[in-house]
Every structure is written in structure tokens, then in C-alpha cells.
């Protein structure tokens, strides 16, 4: 009878109603890195590093780039005869120049403050070319004879289209005094130059005067140039050199020229009609007849990700450049399906749901929730309130991280612009150093936040567990695996009250108390039964052993193997 009671009690315990707290799992293979671990598989992750581009030059927000093809910026602005297709250009979004364009300064020489001029162009989107000193106005000088075989056009000697090389006329070079007043509302880009002859004979042949000068003045510029006569190696068939200069003439300001020789005078100037974000990109790519919001020298990027690792130079609404190969933010939970039965590792910030052995693939409508079983059946149900709060929290965290890192990189970007102007030789090293630091910061922040996110999910599971535990109290038993075993019958309505936090503890406490006491009594009774059986077994075993020893002794005495003496 006692055995039957014990068996029934055990069966009753096995079939008790249960509710378990757990978390979502799926078939995801997405992995993230944390401070403590690498390649942690998670249910959801967000890649924040763009690695792809289209390999083409594209329009930027519908505006075409100015692709200089085989011409350099200097060749375009001065008017190299081989760059006639760029005499008048429409508005551009950015400028593309090859690394070594063939059509640069056709007459050998130098362009003063060339990098500074390029920097200026990175803030301009449109020029309008205007004539400021007509070529025909030089009546006392030869304005058409200043040509060179170094600048051919249609097989004949020619010269830059936008400046005039003035030569002596009738064996005389009268002193030039010319002024131009900028009556426009826009700034003007004005270019001029000086010719450095090969020897004194060339000097007098071209300009008559053996000693010459060029003076240029504005409200902000005071320049005096003299030719440097020297024997030089030939470049493009020329031993002479030309040096070009530029300035920005503000509205209502005037530029004054004075010279008695070697003067390369401006004919055209560029009215800056539109300023804005632009760039000069070194690229060999072809135009792709496409549109983008972000362009790099490697190709266009069309992405909403906050970072990319394609090229540090960009134009448009672009992700921020880092040197990383991988930046992935965890947005979901550790993906540990229950069937794997792997022990969860605790994180740096104290993961506290490690007692739950695995996630549920059957729960698909939330991150955290319940699994119940009773006489009416079993099933999964997500806790939507905690899931939504977690989603909002993770989303806000991701956005905060992105905004935080964007602000840092924008600040560095402005510093790089200043370095490019002032410390050109150190710019590359400084740029690499800053990028190394900010890349490290971005990677470290992602690792830290991934650790926090995973522990945040663990904490949410533990909070849900505590919510149930505080409701049930001693009406149920904690099984240690995230589950509770009821001491009373809990139908679907009862289960629902536990899930939504309205469980009525007093309603079930009496039934739970009786069942708890009955189970405790069965345990005590079964323990007493086992103690009696144990004593009986011990006595019986000892008696059987004594009988065997006595029988063996009598047998040995009867056959003489053992001598028995009775005193």
C-alpha cells in the first residue's frame, strides 16, 4: 500500500502544471565580437560598416561631375589648347583629375600656391568666365605673337587661351599700367604670369629691355616679380620657364598691373557664381551615367550605414571613413537554441540569466516570454511589453552610438582640412595617425556596447523571471532552470494571469499549501519506510552470514579438517 501511495505521488509530481521563462532563438548565424568573446552568434545584428561601391563616377544628387579627362586643373584654368572642351563648363558637383594628366602646363614652369587653389576649388561649384582685359586692347605690344611650339593646336604653335603673352612691338616695350575694377557682386579668380628666359639674348629679343619687373597690387596683395634668367635643360623643347600666380579679387576692389617686360597678362577671369561643398578627386574611373549621394575615388556608395572603409576622401552625404574591416552591433540576444544545451558564459557586466540553458525557437513573436504546460495543453507566448521596451532601448542605443561617433569623426575631418593647407608634407602621416586612433575608438566602443547589449538582454530575462517568482511565492517550486512547478492546478486563465501580472496568490494558496504538505508527508513516509527496510535488510544479511559460517564450521569438524574442542 505504501509503495502504491509513493508511486502515485511521484506520478502526480511529474504531471504538475509548469510555467517557464525564456528567450527567443532562431536559425541566425550572425556573429558579433564583445570585450570578452569573439564570434558570438546572436539572433539579430546590425552591420554598420559599408564595404561595397559601384566602381563608377556618378552624378551627385543629380549634378554631374566635372571630369577633366586628360587635363589638369592648371591646364583647364589657364586654357591649355588641348583642353578646349572645358572653355565653358556648367555647374559641377565635384572635379575629377587623373593622377598624371597629359595636358598640364604645356609651356614648362610652375603654378604658385597650386594646392591652395585646389583647396579653394573644393568650395566652388560653378565658374562663369568673363573677359577683363581684351586681347585687342594691347595696341603698343604684340598680343598675338606670344605663342610656343610647346602648346600646339591643329599642328601650329599656340598658347594658353585665358592669358596673353605680351611681346615687344616695333623694337619697344613701353611700360604697362593697367587696372581692373571688380564691379561684379561675386568674387573673381584672376590669373597672370611671368616668363623666365633662358639667356640675356632671349630677354632682349622678346622684351627689348634687359632689366624688367612686374608689379601687382590689390587691397590685400603687394607683389613685385623679376625674371630669373638662367640656362636650363629643355622641357617640351623649351629652355625658358613660366610661373603663374592667382588671386581672389573681391567686389569693388581693383587689381593694378605694372610691367616693362616678361608679363603674361590676364584676358579672362573666373566669376565665382556658386559656392558649396565640392572636391577634387584623383581617379581614373569612367563616368557611369548614374546618381548617388556619396562619391569616392573608388566609386559611388549608396548606403545608410554610418561607416565605410572604401576611401578616406568622399564628397556628399557619406558614411564616415574608418580602417576597420568589421563593425557589427548586436541588437538581439545570444542565439543559443535549447537543443544545443550549451552553458552560457557570463559577460563583463554580469550576465544574470545564465541559469536558463537555451533559447526557444518556437517563440517567434518576441524576444522574451513564457512556455506553459497544463491539462489544457502547452504553448509559447511572448512578453510584448518587455520586448518592446528592449527594442526601443537597443534602437536608441544604436542611434546614440552612431551619432556619437559621427560627431567625433566630423570634428577630425575639419582638422584635416586645416592640416592640408598648412602642413602639406605632414598631412598624410597625421591623417593616418588620426584615422588609426578613431578606428580604434570605434572598434572599442562597438565591443563594449555589444557586451552591454547582450547583458542587457540577460537582465531583462532575469527581471521577467523575478516578476513571476514574486507573484507565485510558495505556491510554486523553482526548478532552477527558469521554470516553476505549481503546487496547484493552473488552467489557461491562471497561466494568463501570471503572464500579465494579475496572478491572485490568495486564491490558490490553500490548495498549494495542502498539496505542498501532502508531498512533504509522502516524502517523510517514504523516508521512514526506506529506513525500516534498510534495518531489516541489514539484520537479515548478518543472520544469513552467521548461519553460513556455523554450517561451514560443522562440516569441517565432521571431516577432520577442523578440530573442535568443547570446554
UniProtKB/Swiss-Prot annotation:
Its main location: virion. One of its GO terms (cellular component) is membrane. The record marks 346-347 as: Cleavage. A lipid is attached at residues 557, 564, 567 (S-palmitoyl cysteine). GO terms for molecular function: host cell surface receptor binding. Disulfide bonds join 20-483, 71-83, 106-151, 294-318, 490-494. GO terms for biological process: clathrin-dependent endocytosis of virus by host cell; fusion of virus membrane with host endosome membrane; fusion of virus membrane with host plasma membrane; virion attachment to host cell. The chain crosses the membrane at residues 532-552. It is found in: Virion membrane; Host apical cell membrane. Keywords: Clathrin- and caveolin-independent endocytosis of virus by host, Clathrin-mediated endocytosis of virus by host, Disulfide bond, Fusion of virus membrane with host endosomal membrane, Fusion of virus membrane with host membrane, Glycoprotein, Hemagglutinin, Host cell membrane, Host membrane, Host-virus interaction, Lipoprotein, Membrane, Palmitate, Signal, Transmembrane, Transmembrane helix, Viral attachment to host cell, Viral envelope protein, Viral penetration into host cytoplasm, Virion, Virus endocytosis by host, Virus entry into host cell. Belongs to the influenza viruses hemagglutinin family. Homotrimer of disulfide-linked HA1-HA2. Major glycoprotein, comprises over 80% of the envelope proteins present in virus particle. The extent of infection into host organism is determined by HA. Influenza viruses bud from the apical surface of polarized epithelial cells (e.g. bronchial epithelial cells) into lumen of lungs and are therefore usually pneumotropic. The reason is that HA is cleaved by tryptase clara which is restricted to lungs. However, HAs of H5 and H7 pantropic avian viruses subtypes can be cleaved by furin and subtilisin-type enzymes, allowing the virus to grow in other organs than lungs. This is Hemagglutinin.
